[in-house]
């Protein structure tokens, strides 16, 4: 599971734009 910080950052960026 080496996709924690990178994936989380990418998801947060997408969710941030969607939640705009």
Swiss-Prot record:
Superkingdom of source = Bacteria
Q: Which GO terms describe its molecular function?
A: rRNA binding
- Assigned keywords, A-Z: Ribonucleoprotein, Ribosomal protein, RNA-binding, rRNA-binding
One GO cellular component term of this record is: ribonucleoprotein complex
Keyword flag Nucleus: no
The job of this chain, per UniProt, is described as: Forms part of the ribosomal stalk, playing a central role in the interaction of the ribosome with GTP-bound translation factors.
Q: How does it assemble?
A: Part of the ribosomal stalk of the 50S ribosomal subunit. The N-terminus interacts with L11 and the large rRNA to form the base of the stalk. The C-terminus forms an elongated spine to which L12 dimers bind in a sequential fashion forming a multimeric L10(L12)X complex.
User: What family does this chain come from, according to its entry?
Assistant: Belongs to the universal ribosomal protein uL10 family.
Name of the featured protein: Large ribosomal subunit protein uL10
Instruction: State the organism of origin.
Output: Citrobacter freundii
Its organism's taxonomic lineage begins at: Bacteria, Pseudomonadati, Pseudomonadota, Gammaproteobacteria, Enterobacterales
